[in-house]
A protein has these predicted regions:
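Hydrophobic structural segments
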Residues: 1-108
């Protein structure tokens, strides 16, 4: 299965259109529709989570809380968000968040 296919399935179950206005659910980092080698589930994307995905050869992280809530103005090494984004891109890891859209669907 490819990244976009799993993202479509997740969006069918918990449509991004149902998220709160302040939220940022959906495919936050795309890995160019690569074939999925493994999926790592987490509550929050942290540097340890990205490192675990690399170690376990998972190239898709499914998180409840979005890593990116507001627009990034730069990607440096100064914040954990910037470091996670940079490392995920370097290792071809997609990150998908299902937050308030998942909270409001039945069985979500």
């Amino acid at each position: 299965m490819k990244t976009n296919e799993l993202a479509d399935i997740l969006n069918e179950f918990a449509p991004v259109s149902l998220q709160e206005k302040w939220d940022n659910a959906g495919l936050l980092i795309d890995n160019e529709n690569s074939y999925i080698t493994g999926v790592l589930l987490c509550l929050d994307v942290t540097e340890k989570v990205v490192d675990e995905a690399i170690q376990k050869k998972c190239n898709f992280i499914l998180a409840h809380h979005p890593l990116i809530f507001k627009g990034l103005t730069k990607i440096t090494q100064h914040t954990y968000t910037e470091r996670c984004v940079r490392k995920a891109i370097q290792h071809n890891i997609a990150i998908y968040a299902a937050h308030t859209n998942m909270d409001v669907v039945m069985n979500g």
